[in-house]
Amino acid sequence: MAGAKEIRSKIASIKSTQKITSAMEKVAVSKMRKAQMRMAASRPYAERIRQVIGHLANANPEYRHPFMIERPVKRAGYIVVSSDRGLCGGLNTNLFKALVKDMNENREQGVEIDLCVIGSKGATFFRIFGGNVVAAISHLGEEPSINDLIGSVKVMLDAYLDGRIDRLSVVSNKFINTMTQKPTVEQLVPLVATPDQDLKHHWDYLYEPDAKELLDGLMVRYVESQVYQAVVENNAAEQAARMIAMKNATDNAGDLISELQLIYNKARQAAITQEISEIVGGAAAV
């Protein structure tokens, strides 16, 4: 029964792991719901501030903010939003694949790359595979604050205003639904006009201070809000991916336990049959 003992030990070990993955799945479900609430709460602000920017730009058409001016791209910047922890399936791997593809397309055109990395997994990736990381931040926790991001975002915005980079994009996972998380690369600056944006929002307001001064401040707030939205949405995507990964691990553990239990029963049955045969053989010899 030595084989049976080993199988019993494996079954006990897998059951212990199954309890852990099941608990992690339940925790991920709870965290995902909270992250979804934060995501839904911050989304209207990000959308509204863009509408205000569009109106301010129309209110002062002779002034073109640097964040709205297209220029030849010699150097591009990326703000990469990754997770701090693993055990979330292929979430980070898929994100890095999308990022590397976009970076390679730029490099083929002679464009150099600067990176701002949010999250430990992104920092580890670029430490291993290389990349010009000019700013990094990690361990934002389950409830990230926009104030935690301002410093890193400012590094990239200052680089854009100084002409050291000519385009800035944010790379993150979009939360589509519980089962789907989509890696995306979105351009932040220069600001890309949305179709019919100017036609939908015509407000007759007087601004104090003037529209130009407000626009200068709001453009920075807009970029910060977009990065914050990306972080919150990536967090929701991370928890959803972890929930699915832990559910799959729990289910696979159950299947493996069933298989091992069957093998154990067969081994035990074979041992009993052998013992009976030996007893019968001994009795016949007597």
Curated annotation (Swiss-Prot):
Where would you find this protein in the cell? Answer: Cell inner membrane
Molecular-function GO terms, alphabetical: ATP binding; proton-transporting ATP synthase activity, rotational mechanism
Its GO biological process terms?
Answer: proton motive force-driven plasma membrane ATP synthesis
Main subcellular location of this protein, as a coarse class = membrane
Instruction: Tell me which family the UniProt entry assigns to this protein.
Output: Belongs to the ATPase gamma chain family.
Q: What is this protein called?
A: ATP synthase gamma chain
Instruction: Provide one Gene Ontology cellular component.
Output: proton-transporting ATP synthase complex
- What Pfam families does the record tag this protein with? ATP-synt (PF00231)
Function according to Swiss-Prot or TrEMBL: Produces ATP from ADP in the presence of a proton gradient across the membrane. The gamma chain is believed to be important in regulating ATPase activity and the flow of protons through the CF(0) complex.
NCBIfam families (UniProt xref): ATPsyn_F1gamma, PRK05621.1-1
Q: Which keywords belong to this entry?
A: ATP synthesis, Cell inner membrane, Cell membrane, CF(1), Hydrogen ion transport, Ion transport, Membrane, Transport
